[in-house]
């Protein structure tokens, strides 16, 4: 039997044990993390089904969020995965982007342990989405391989993130006046198709500077450099209302390398080649003609090929002006040769006419001498020189005559001269390099006639008697040889009337027109200097000019 003192002690021990057990259970409950409970709930598919069913219960996707109330704000941003190519002929560009849109739909708010509902594209068709379209897009494609490339997420507060992968071909108006030193601002415009700004507006998610991202590895273009992008927004009015339009400008600057190799350097080399013809002799007509025609055809081919990479614009570009000036230089080189050839022929014709008049004047000289006999020379010095030469001729003949019977030969030989009182130097005729020239023909006649009159007046040595010198004597032929023979030939060609025959007065050869024309000499300096000055002005103007198109800033 338990004593009365032990009963209270046992009851107290049970109470303490119960209190301790309760404290331990409470501590265990407090130490249990809420994440584990949330994880357990996430692992249950019934939670997702319950939340989605509750969201779509009574939801009408035909009505925008806040219908009849405040304006729906759609925030957008763009991530460019690939930019290009850019077509100058079609004036368009193509790019691949991730196009993101964010808005708040309070009808999709939910309570639960799940912070974000990550859903597939099947949910997109069951909720309201903005009717965004690209205003300047020519063709836009939403990728569907292997499934539609769409991302759809619903946050607990009703915020919705909708992302699509798109390939967009958009129009890029280009002003090609400065081609190929030009730059362009290619726009991408998008907005709501049906909702005016009184119901829906667009804004940039990260602000104007960071809402459009273009990585460097995504903008590797062949003919352009993507130097940056800017954003703006504008309001467009139409008969259905005013609409907000968001615009992104991609700034492109053209690369010059291709056009330098393909057009500019060949044009410069062709012009230089056309100017080489100025250093070719003007008589080389085939060579200079080939130079001119070949360079003109080459410039024509270059101008045609340069236009293939451009649209058929009605104005001239910077490259068109350069090609036109190069073509003008090449064509001018061909015209220059035509001018040289023309003036050379004119000069040769004038020289021929002067040459044809000279023999007529010479043939008229003997006729004047018959009417007006020549008087003795008035110049005493020339007369004395003539007499000395004739005296030397007589003395030489006399020395030879002492050993040879001159009398026998003189009866058989004809004398060189006829009796006359005219005095003209005979030795001048014999020493002349061309005794049959027009200038010496008249002097030859006078010299042949003047020999007998000169001999008697010439003082002689003692024991010698002056006498006529027969041309045909052997001693004379031995001593003077060819000179007297030329005199004899000239005298025999003279007729009884004293006129020169046509055969004794051969006309001088006509001028050949060889040498360098003055036009060529001027062209050798003028053409290169002018072309160099043109290139200097051309490149300084266009390389220092700001040719980048300006985008409109309407923020």
UniProtKB/Swiss-Prot annotation:
Region (Disordered): 354-435, 495-516
NCBIfam families in the cross-refs: LIC
Domain free text: The GABA-binding pockets are located at the interface between neighboring alpha and beta subunits. GABAARs subunits share a common topological structure: a peptide sequence made up of a long extracellular N-terminal, four transmembrane domains, intracellular or cytoplasmic domain located between the third and the fourth transmembrane domains.
Purpose of the protein: Alpha subunit of the heteropentameric ligand-gated chloride channel gated by gamma-aminobutyric acid (GABA), a major inhibitory neurotransmitter in the brain. GABA-gated chloride channels, also named GABA(A) receptors (GABAAR), consist of five subunits arranged around a central pore and contain GABA active binding site(s) located at the alpha and beta subunit interface(s). When activated by GABA, GABAARs selectively allow the flow of chloride anions across the cell membrane down their electrochemical gradient.
Gene Ontology CC annotations of this record: chloride channel complex; dendrite membrane; GABA-A receptor complex; postsynapse; postsynaptic membrane
Binding site for 4-aminobutanoate: 100, 163
Regulation of this protein's activity per its record: Potentiated by histamine.
Biased composition range(s): Polar residues: 422-435
Tissues with expression: Expressed in the brain.
BP term (GO), one: synaptic transmission, GABAergic
Signal sequence extent: 1-35
Low complexity: bias regions: 410-421
Disulphide-bonded residues: 172-186
Protein name according to UniProt: Gamma-aminobutyric acid receptor subunit alpha-4
Localization, UniProt: Cell membrane; Postsynaptic cell membrane
Quaternary assembly: Heteropentamer, formed by a combination of alpha (GABRA1-6), beta (GABRB1-3), gamma (GABRG1-3), delta (GABRD), epsilon (GABRE), rho (GABRR1-3), pi (GABRP) and theta (GABRQ) chains, each subunit exhibiting distinct physiological and pharmacological properties.
Name of the encoding gene: GABRA4
InterPro entries associated with the record: GABAA/Glycine_rcpt, GABAAa_rcpt, GABBAa4_rcpt, Gabra-1-6_TM, Neur_chan_lig-bd, Neur_chan_lig-bd_sf, Neur_channel, Neuro-gated_channel_TM_sf
Transmembrane parts of this sequence: 260-280, 285-305, 319-341, 519-545
Gene3D superfamilies named in the record: Neurotransmitter-gated ion-channel ligand-binding domain (2.70.170.10), Neurotransmitter-gated ion-channel transmembrane domain (1.20.58.390)
Catalytic activity: chloride(in) = chloride(out)
Natural source organism: Bos taurus (Bovine)
Cytoplasmic compartment segments: 281-284, 342-518
GO MF, any single term: GABA-gated chloride ion channel activity
Glycosylation-annotated residues: 47, 144, 157
Membrane topology (UniProt): Multi-pass membrane protein
């Amino acid at each position: 039997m338990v004593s009365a003192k032990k009963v209270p002690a046992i009851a107290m021990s049970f109470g303490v044990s119960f209190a301790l057990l309760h404290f331990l259970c409470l501590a265990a409950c407090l130490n249990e993390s809420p994440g584990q409970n949330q994880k357990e709930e996430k692992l249950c598919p019934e939670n997702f089904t319950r939340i989605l069913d509750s969201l779509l219960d009574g939801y009408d996707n035909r009505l925008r969020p806040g219908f009849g109330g405040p304006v729906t704000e759609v925030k957008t941003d763009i991530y460019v995965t690939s930019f290009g190519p850019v077509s100058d002929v079609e004036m368009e560009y193509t790019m691949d982007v991730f196009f993101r849109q964010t808005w708040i739909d309070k009808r999709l708010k939910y309570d639960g342990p799940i912070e974000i509902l990550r859903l597939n594209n099947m949910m997109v068709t069951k909720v309201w989405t903005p009717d965004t379209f690209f205003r300047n897009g020519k063709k836009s494609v939403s990728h569907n391989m292997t499934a539609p490339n769409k991302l759809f997420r619903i946050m607990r507060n009703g915020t919705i993130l909708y992302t699509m992968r798109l390939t967009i071909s958009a129009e890029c108006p280009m002003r090609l006046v400065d081609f190929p030193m030009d730059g362009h601002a290619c726009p991408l415009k998008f907005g709501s198709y049906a909702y005016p700004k009184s119901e829906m507006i667009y804004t940039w998610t990260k602000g104007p500077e960071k809402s459009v991202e273009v990585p460097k590895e995504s903008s590797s273009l062949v003919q352009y450099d993507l130097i940056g992008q800017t954003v703006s927004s504008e309001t467009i009015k139409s008969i259905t209302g005013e609409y907000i339009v968001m615009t992104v400008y991609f700034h492109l600057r053209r690369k010059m390398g291709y056009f330098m190799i393909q057009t500019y350097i060949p044009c410069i080399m062709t012009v230089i080649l056309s100017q080489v013809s100025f250093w070719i002799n003007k008589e080389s007509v085939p060579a200079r003609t080939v130079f001119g025609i070949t360079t003109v055809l080459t410039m024509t081919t270059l101008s045609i090929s340069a236009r293939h990479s451009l649209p058929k614009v009605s104005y001239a570009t910077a490259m068109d002006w350069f090609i036109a000036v190069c073509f003008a230089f090449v064509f001018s080189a061909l015209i220059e040769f035509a001018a040289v050839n023309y003036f050379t022929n004119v000069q040769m014709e004038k020289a021929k006419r002067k040459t044809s008049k000279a023999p007529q004047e010479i043939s008229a000289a003997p006729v004047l001498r018959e009417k007006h006999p020549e008087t003795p020379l008035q110049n005493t010095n020339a007369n004395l020189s003539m007499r000395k030469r004739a005296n030397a001729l007589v003395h030489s003949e006399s020395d030879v005559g002492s050993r040879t019977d001159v009398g026998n030969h003189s009866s058989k030989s004809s004398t060189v001269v006829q009796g006359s009182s005219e005095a003209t130097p005979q030795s001048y005729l014999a020493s002349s390099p061309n005794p049959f020239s027009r200038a010496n023909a008249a002097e030859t006649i006078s010299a042949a006639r003047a020999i007998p009159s000169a001999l008697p007046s010439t003082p002689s040595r003692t024991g010698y008697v002056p006498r006529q010198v027969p041309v045909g004597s052997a001693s004379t032929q031995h001593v003077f040889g060819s000179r007297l023979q030329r005199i004899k030939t000239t005298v025999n060609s003279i007729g009884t009337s004293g006129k020169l025959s046509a055969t004794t007065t051969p006309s001088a050869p006509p001028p050949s027109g060889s040498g360098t024309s003055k036009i060529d000499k001027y062209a050798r300096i003028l053409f290169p200097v002018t072309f160099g000055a043109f290139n200097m002005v051309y490149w300084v103007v266009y390389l220092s000019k700001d040719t980048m198109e300006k985008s409109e800033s309407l923020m």
